[in-house]
């Protein structure tokens, strides 16, 4: 860490000297950003006491990816990419170690907004990046150290600004295709007429997937109608999107060694649908006061089917259900003393019952045993959420005591209603690892539950969460170089959960979480093109309805699925410190922009996900303290012929406590399935080192070529919180792209991903190789507990773009 900190301090020094030489040659253009979710009168970027990274529309087009996460990963220092779902359209990003993920079960530490609307889903704060059309994005601003964005902004916030007819005019259509059966297309149209504007964007994509049984289909639409005059501007906008995926997920490493495209148990599919309607606007009350506001309604539906390994065994002869099917009881705490009625009740609770509440017998013959049957389950969940809300904000830019000043006050309300149901059916794992039914085996295809509702229990619940926020922030120019910012946001989260079936009354709960989060900092303009900043803030996130219902290790949940009665969770509080430099200067006929910073976020009562001994299940737990600290360095040079960028990030993400955590499939786990964590152990799934670089070169006025390099360091497997096992290896990927403008309106383009066809993994965790799949007749015997999500091999795509 010391060497990295020295690098973070010294590297900007070279650029500072350059700034001094260039100071007289240029006056940097003022860049205005919106530092609150609502788009209104922004603020000079150099007066914001934290890091801001902006990704522009050209960057999304340059990446030529249907996934917004690919571009954020490529262009934002400190953003890493993970893929626990095993599908490139459903990847998650982690910024400074905090996640924004579509996966239920991932604790979410980033707030995501579009048009002032919170995109974190109501039920689990997840972010479904696949539902956002990339061609409709004008820019994406990634903020740190800013609690004004409300809940989940522990690591920062991503604020997406879509295009409209005032900011984008014309017509553009493109179609492309290539490896693994991919065909994708998009169009956008924008027009301005008098006070009115219109904008629409649409995208579609179909891909068979490079891994087995991993097809993808996407359809996305965004539209905007705007009106403005000298004092006001209003936009009515809406979007609809649908997506379906084959979710290949992680595969045992021994299977990948035989076939890099192999998958473990199937089916694994996810289908998402969403619709959004919103209205936002701003109105100039006076020369100094501006009012901004938004209203919205949003619908989201998700259906998930997951074929899983079955952790079943023949019931104990000491139970009331000998020669019947039971859930394996390994990993569950036995009562003390383990005798008599207590022992009998413990064993009986694991008996598997069918939809008619009857125990399921073992198949006849072979000693009437269940132990040789490759049992599996098909788990199904459905989530339907309706969210609506609004926000109102006032901005004043009147001078205070003769000094420049910007004051913002606002508030927001977001309310979500969710209906959720989940169930498991008993299945049979065939040699190809597909989970289906076998009529020769009793209980096949029946919805199952355990006698004690442990691990398996049909569920139907409704939840309601209402989030209130009120905030104020002020930036005061102490001098023409020195600006001070101070602000505060008060969050209230009311969360209600109700059991619809009436079979799990312990699920019924009413919870309230609240907190006042301050922010403060200073910026100092050392030179016209060089600014120093320092800031401090606090932020919080409340446990989600999913997390509140899934924190009991004795009743684990199928993540993305079942909820159970549980001990309460505490809200997470983050304390962030940040210092840095940023600058811009003229260089070699172009412009150079750079930034360098140090950061630290200490989180108390952090929520983490822990695995259960039951396949596919886990639970949530507060841990006393975690720390994420590090360095970010980045620079970008642009001229008429060149674009060059490079960034480096170092993230030291560690636990700051001693204690036992559950990780039953970890090779180093003790007899109780636990591992021991001590202060300084690294949080799994977060690479310490990342280096990214790219270049574009205009060979001629019509022909452009470019390349990108992404190098990611080692990281610990998820589940190796004690850092006792080998790490997930580092990797590097080189991508190429080119475009040729055939005429004024027509451009041909092509992309190559993973030029050198490197084999690498985006995610690693552990599994139990002795489960039901081990009895399915596999051609190899699985013994290695490591399981990986492999990265995509060499792929090439090409297309045509027409712009009028």
List the predicted regions and their residue ranges:
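Face-selective signature of the C-terminal outer-membrane beta-barrel domain
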Residues: 233, 273-305, 309-311, 315-498, ...
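C-terminal beta-signal and adjacent terminal beta-strands/loops
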Residues: 540, 609, 710-720, 739-804
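A beta-strand signature from Gram-negative outer-membrane beta-barrel systems
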Residues: 119-121, 130-174, 184
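Membrane-embedded beta-barrel scaffold of Gram-negative outer-membrane proteins
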Residues: 284, 290-296, 300-304, 525, ...
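Surface-exposed extracellular loop regions of Gram-negative outer-membrane beta-barrel proteins
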Residues: 242-258, 417, 494-499, 510, ...
